[in-house]
């Protein structure tokens, strides 16, 4: 299915040679992408009018306040103070716990807010700031991040990977599945985060690898790692694929060295304010690995949380033991696809390796929260044309796993709307041909699918029914 590594020229459906630009014009993909991108942008705008994490809920509010507070800190304090506990930077109040690139992003967005609404990022006095204009500016920072990072990266991936093959309607369907992923929209534009930046950088790195620009890929993926450390979910796939390609070249040691220098150089530039002092360096590292939070957070649909109903992991094992257990479980489940890519690297195998690697981390790694499902969803979205059935059900249950968070953030209305929109687009007339064929499966398969959908609806109803009751009981205990 995938293009062979190093293939420079593709064939179109008529067998003629073509390049990316010819394909874009001939298939009119550029116009399709623009229309879908505009619609995806408007959907994001609509979702952003709804509440966000911790809205009107003092004293610590939620992720919205965390992002605003990081802008306040990075704007008003020198870089060496950003990760250090002090009288001006209380790390117990939403202290920075992401790598330096997130801090730089917060600084740039803070400059934008200070120009138009300085009181929203003033030191100390802006805590819990929730003015209408401040919220509007904050929402625009996420929207602009999507436009600058995610949208161009998706376009590059489609051009690089699908040039010369595939029907126009299939490509348009794939673009819609990626740009209108309901989970990402709800987390970034509802709950309030900037996952679009790290995911956009990762997609850009994938596109660079598929076009044999390994040095560019190393820089982009290093930037993704330095924006959100959870991008390490993809690291085994990148490492094994690039190593496999290097080993097949004339001078493998030189090739590996070049890629290593690109990674080290990128990290050195990003970490420059902190590499001059071991104390400062270790201080940042300690903020990036919050093991004290425990094995998992909230209602995360991974192995440890699911099996905790029967096996009380947190009671039976110490944190140190669980760290080792989760580490080896993650490594062992990543290993098959890593070995395959080192032995026989291919573009399609690389995409499946990304899926396997990210799922291994999501299911078995230490300290996973419900928003981490966005990471395995990314390669699943990129593979939606190859695996439409599995992509649909992964998205379905990813949304279901996020439902408690959406209830807590009062985002049930956009949750239901995006759930419906996803299925409308998935089965859209003229969309992916395989999806229409699957509308009439075998009787057993049809029964199982219907049963699973009913179970999902039942779980939604149970949670909505019981959640108010648990809130009342907890308030009575207090």
Whereabouts are the PLM-identified features?
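Membrane-embedded helix bundles of polyisoprenyl
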Residues: 40, 152-160, 166-207, 214-230, ...
